[in-house]
Amino acid sequence: DLMLMFFTSGTTGYPKMAAHSFKYPLGHFITAKYWHCVDPEGLHLTISDTGWAKAMWGKLYGQWLCEAAIFVYDFDRFDAHDLLPLFAKHHITTFCAPPTMYRMMIKQDLSQYDFSTVQRATTAGEALNPEVFRQFEAQTGLQIYEGFGQTEGPVLLATFPWIEPRPGSMGKPSPLYDIDIVDENGEPCEDGIV
């Protein structure tokens, strides 16, 4: 049975509907447990508007299935200066935000903020440039673990705990999927093809 509908961002044309059944939330267990690394004793924050599928797969379904508490941060316009004190004030342990927000965060003097409760920082939604990865790590001691998902399903590729984060890498396929990168004819590409 149909549970909910999202619309894609329309990257390749008009937005397209993605319909999901009641099995949909179960696919996000891997997102929360093995990419975000949420903990039943922790507090998770994903920054995503509820109009996006990422709100469901980044801060609700998998996280609740893993018994994690969710921190909700609402804003009319994102301001890193307003967000940064909340990590220490509320003891946020896991965090996910789009690369654009990390770019805004590193423009602040991050040494003024306490990230000691944060165990994992993740990102998805667009490419994370290597300079942001390096600056965030240098200023906070935290590496950013990238992932890739779509409106149509859960996380497909991610830097899971058993993978060392590397600037510019989205990680490896989720254990749920066999993933091939194919050329314009649908044929699998060899390793190293860009």
Residues covered by each model-derived region:
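Generic short beta-strand
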Residues: F6, D178-I179
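Active-site phosphate/pyrophosphate- and oxyanion-stabilizing loops and adjacent acidic/basic residues
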Residues: F6, I30, R134, G168
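Short Gly/Pro-enriched turn/cap motifs at secondary-structure boundaries
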Residues: G168-S174
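Conserved AMP-binding/adenylation subdomain of ANL enzymes
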Residues: L26-L43, T50-T93, Q108
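Conserved beta-loop-beta connector loops within the AMP-binding
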Residues: D180-V194
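Active-site beta-alpha turn of Rossmann-fold NAD(P)-dependent dehydrogenases/reductases
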Residues: F6-S9, S48, P154
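Gly/Ser/Thr-rich phosphate-binding loop
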Residues: L65, I92-A97, I106-R166, D178, ...
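Conserved AMP-binding A3 loop
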Residues: M3-G27
